[in-house]
Amino acid sequence: MNEKRWRKEPGARVEGFRDLDRSKVQAPGIARDPSGGFRLFYTGVGPGRPFPTCQGYILSAVSDDGLSFRPEPGIRLAPQPGVPHMGLRTLSPTVAPCEEGCWRMYFESRGPASLPTVICSAISTDMLHWKHEDGIRLQGFDGLGGPRYVVLPDGRARLFCCAEERGSD
């Protein structure tokens, strides 16, 4: 059997030290930058959040080698308080190139606890400035989250997510 084994490398790739990410850094998703290197998108939480009830937003960092990352200033994607399903947090980004030469980010989103988590998307031409796309991409599952966009060997792609199945027991 041809088995691959993963080995954890020493050191953190991104550490929270700014007001935007001092409290939490989690759920990274990486994309190759067409101009070279890599851009890591991740969830951040800290005292510099965009509004008092915000529970998470998406930040980014760049790297030439995929090991040493430099955080970029600002928030890439923040919750939208006026949109019920996106009012409190945007988490767990995954980024994919589009045929039109732009980029699409899929992410977990949440409003108040009375609404379930959903998967939404945003679009960008430069991977720095993102525009929320209207609507919900995926919904209807308990505990939905953690989207990951994966290109298959034949060129098709799939969007994988986590979800809980709650039985009647």
Where are these regions (language model features)?
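Beta-rich carbohydrate-recognition and catalytic domains
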Residues: 1-88, 92, 96-146, 150-169
